[in-house]
Amino acid sequence: MSQTITLIKDKILSDNYFTLRNITYDLTRRNGEVIRHKREVYDRGNGATILLYNSTKKTVLLVRQFRVATWVNGNQDGMLIETCAGLLDNDEPEVCIRKEAIEETGYDVGEVRKIFELYMSPGGVTELIHFFIAEYHDSERASIGGGVEDEEIEVLELPFSRALEMVRSGEIRDGKTVLLLNYLQTSHLMD
């Protein structure tokens, strides 16, 4: 017998920016036992992220920006170094990530390649992130980047080896960024 889930109650606790819901459900275990659970679930929509790399120059493009959740959790200045990313907002993942790449980094890249999609914090957050990589070239620079009006984003072009060192030293602590840098390393695209 497989597990079955029965929704008992779905109550919205807050929908000011994203949606925080209180979910009550019964989980019927494989042995037939029914257990009632009550959990809060944060729904912020799905997202996409991309690591831009240049195999000739052996560099990657990352961004540095303020992330309030990290500040609340002890990151003194709230600044985080990460891959370009954004919420889908009803766009297809590739459409979203192309827009975000131009807005944040200023690069209008050619071919993008989807690597995988992952739940980053499935214990309480619904978000599914689509992961991409793309090679960038200086000729594809369309603007200075930096994000939209309410964002202040610094574009960082780093040697790939330096980015990997920054993961080890704790200067890069964003999960999606670490995953994509490790993917780039193990795929040997920078060899």
Curated annotation (Swiss-Prot):
SUPFAM superfamilies linked to this entry: Nudix
Catalytic activity: GDP-alpha-D-mannose + H2O = alpha-D-mannose 1-phosphate + GMP + 2 H(+)
Positions of GDP-alpha-D-mannose binding: Y17, K38, R39, E40, R67, A85, G86, L87, E104, E127, D150, E151, K176
PROSITE patterns: NUDIX (PS51462)
Listed cofactors: Mg(2+)
Annotated keywords: Hydrolase, Magnesium, Metal-binding
Protein name: GDP-mannose pyrophosphatase
Natural source organism: Salmonella paratyphi B (strain ATCC BAA-1250 / SPB7)
